From Swiss-Prot:
It comes from the Eukaryota. The mature peptide does not contain cysteine residue. This is Neuropeptide Y1-like conopeptide. Its main location: secreted. The lineage of its organism: Eukaryota, Metazoa, Spiralia, Lophotrochozoa, Mollusca.
Amino acid sequence: TVSDPPARPAVFHSREELMNYVRELNRYFAIVGRPRF
């Protein structure tokens, strides 16, 4: 089974927090979007 997407904080307290979230999201979609044969 595929893990759930990263939890989105209600508020981003810093630019770093936002960037970390976006990075995790990209990693998640890279895994989920991989074609399965």
